[in-house]
């Protein structure tokens, strides 16, 4: 199960994961060049972008969406 951390930005959520990812990539739209997981996350209603760090993802959402709804979907994808 991923570990979620709040950030100073209420529309950003840090997700700690247990495996290494390609660092420093920022994704704003789904396309065939993205990793499959990133495309799945970007397609979640309310998510606007995904940033990849060494052992974490940072997901940004539209302000009108609630994290409680988005987190459930993220957990299912991870």
What are these model-derived regions, one by one?
Residues 1, 10, 36, 44-45:
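Short beta-strand-initiation
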Residues 3-5, 48-49:
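Short, surface-exposed charged micro-motifs
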Residues 5-28:
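Short glycine-/aliphatic-rich beta-strand segments at the starts of folded cytosolic domains
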Residues 13-16, 55-62:
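A generic structural motif
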Residues 21-22, 57, 65-67:
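Short, surface-exposed beta-strand-loop junctions and turns on beta-sheet-rich folds
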Residues 27-43:
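Short amphipathic alpha-helix segments
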Residues 38-56:
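Short acidic amphipathic segments
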Residues 64-78:
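Charge-rich, low-aromatic oligomerization/scaffolding segments with amphipathic character
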């Amino acid at each position: 199960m991923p570990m979620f951390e709040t950030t100073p930005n209420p529309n950003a959520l840090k997700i700690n994961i247990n495996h290494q990812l390609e660092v420093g990539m920022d994704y704003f739209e789904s396309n065939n060049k993205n990793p499959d997981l990133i495309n799945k996350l970007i397609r979640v209603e309310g998510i606007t972008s995904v940033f990849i760090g060494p052992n974490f993802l940072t997901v940004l959402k539209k302000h009108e969406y609630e994290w409680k709804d988005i987190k459930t979907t993220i957990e299912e994808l991870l």
